[in-house]
Regions:
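Interfacial loop-to-helix junctions that mark the boundaries of transmembrane helices
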Residues: 24-29, 70-71, 133-140, 229-233, ...
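Alpha-helical multi-pass membrane helix bundles of inner-membrane/thylakoid proteins
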Residues: 143-145, 152-175
């Protein structure tokens, strides 16, 4: 169990304001830094390999290292912006260089994307307000409970499926709110989008959606005076970049097969991490 480096009681109030210090990473123990570096490699891998999961499959591990969500959410948000843009732009750039065709021809379903945004934008904003205003331990426990539910569904191969317009609406509203609080609403949103989009269009349309929603979240963080940890990107963006390249290779493989065993393994890991995180926060509170 990784011992949580809790902030002193008087400094755990929200939001985390900008200071003249570089960031909390200044006095981070070396082995914590190594763990965070490896977790961000994993984050980049699952984001580009699966089209989602950069947050839901990495944030629980990060919170075991340090249980302050507002330390890591800005980092994960910026990585989502950078690598979702790269993933969408890469085919355009490759086609332009190899064939001289620079048309903005993407696999994004813009019409459906506008429909999804119209539904998710309000709960997204409510979730962002919640993560800024609520105490850290409340958000941390909320994240671990949601991750536990996801882990059980993956382990049992019972992923969220929507087969009715009313259920579509419920999943999108919940997914928008959870995304606003913790960036882990992807499985609920994907349950809806996967039913309406071709598989070739799903990943890029998801990335476009994440880009817009995360931009809103980062703008809210900046407006609230939360430290966006810009200096930490100097060493964590390369980590996510390594994972991103590996994930692109995995994505090409996953289009040909159904990686059920992989997702079941992920589910078991998420259950373990979520239970460990809930136990850790309960011990810290007692």
């Amino acid at each position: 169990m990784i011992e949580s480096r809790l902030l002193p009681k008087e400094t755990t109030r929200r939001p985390l304001k900008k200071t003249n210090r570089m960031s909390f990473f200044d006095d981070l123990p070396f082995w914590h830094a190594v763990l965070i570096f490896l977790i961000f490699i994993w984050s980049g891998f699952v984001r580009s390999g699966l089209g989602f999961g950069g947050a839901v499959l990495s944030l629980p591990f990060l919170l075991l290292v340090h249980d302050q969500p507002l330390i890591f959410l800005p980092l994960v948000s910026v990585h989502l912006l950078v690598f979702s843009s790269l993933t969408i732009a890469q085919p355009i750039v490759v086609a332009g260089i190899e064939a001289g065709d620079w048309r903005l021809d993407t696999n994004i379903d813009w019409l459906y994307l506008r429909k999804i945004l119209a539904i998710t934008i309000v709960p997204k904003l409510l979730g962002v307000f919640g993560v800024i205003s609520l105490p850290s331990h409340v958000i941390t426990n909320f994240i671990f409970v949601i991750v536990l539910i996801y882990g059980i569904s993956y382990l049992l191969n019972r992923q969220f499926v929507s087969n009715h317009p009313t259920l579509d609406l419920i999943f999108l509203l919940l997914g928008g709110y959870i995304s606003g609080t913790s960036l882990i609403g992807a499985p609920l949103i994907i349950a809806v989008m996967a039913r309406h989009l071709l598989r070739e269009k799903l990943r890029d349309t998801l990335f476009a959606l994440w880009f817009i929603l995360v931009s809103i979240k980062l703008a809210a963080f900046a407006a609230a005076g939360i430290d966006l940890q810009w200096w930490a990107h100097l060493w964590l963006l390369p980590a996510a970049g390594i994972g991103h390249i590996l994930g692109l290779k995995f994505h090409r493989y996953s289009l040909q097969v159904e990686p059920k065993r992989f997702m079941q393994f992920i589910g078991a890991a998420l259950i373990f991490v979520a239970l460990a995180g809930l136990w850790q926060t309960s011990v810290a509170a007692s």
